[in-house]
Amino acid sequence: SYAHSDNSPDAGFGVIRGDYYYLPLLQLGPDYAPYANLLQSDVLVINIQTDKVEKLISETATHLAMPSQPSYNSCIFMNENKDIYIMCAGYFGFNPENTHSGLVCIPNKGELAQTDFDSSKSWDISSTPIEGTPYKPNTIYSVVYLGGGKVAAFVSAAELNVKDPFTDKNGIAVLMDLNARTIKKIDGIPYTDSHSVGIAKYKDLVVFGVSGKEKRGLFGYNPTTGTTQQLLTTTGGADFFYAFE
């Protein structure tokens, strides 16, 4: 078993690269949080022809934990070089002693023997300022890769927690740059709660699901023009959407 301290390693969403399926293991404890004695990111490398686990690789240097996310398959992605990036939410901001979150990377080295994490490409965002705000992230909720090293994301700021981190409007829509290691607030999208943080691409827009204090629904962001608009108003919080023509 690849589980730590229980019977399930808690598989997240995976991705296929070449002949192998990369399956992150969230390794969650009974409180749906990482084990304090296993602050790392584990990934199984599985042969898609034989379904055999070829190796288990772990990123232990940065202590980024909870790789992938069971709610959003976009939390694991490949860039143009087929380097795999995996979002790590850590403690979802519930542990003030551990606000480490961000992304870990498995570069495209080609050969199975060379396949492993590169901790120099990991990014712990907890010390990165969110430009346009006075905050730094205490967790990351969701991501969508846009290309060119740019990532649309929802991150959280502890200072925005007033009463209840489940319902407080602590989620900030941001644009992250994997190369420059910067995080910028996207103006025009309200702060949201931790359960309305879905992101998806639709045509030339990035669509954010929002449950704001005054506005709720789907908000579109055009990364080319930098403009935002509310696309749909809802009564409750919006998370997923399906578009058809």
Where do the language-model regions lie?
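Entry beta-strands of beta-propeller and related beta-repeat scaffolds
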Residues: 20-23, 81-87, 149-153, 204-208
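Beta-propeller blade signature
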Residues: 36-51, 98-112, 167-179, 221-222
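Loop/turn-rich, solvent-exposed surfaces of beta-rich toroidal or solenoidal domains
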Residues: 133-211
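Structural signature of eukaryotic scaffold interfaces centered on beta-propeller domains
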Residues: 6-18, 28, 69-84, 135-148, ...
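Long, acidic/polar, low-complexity amphipathic helices and coiled-coil-like
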Residues: 1-73
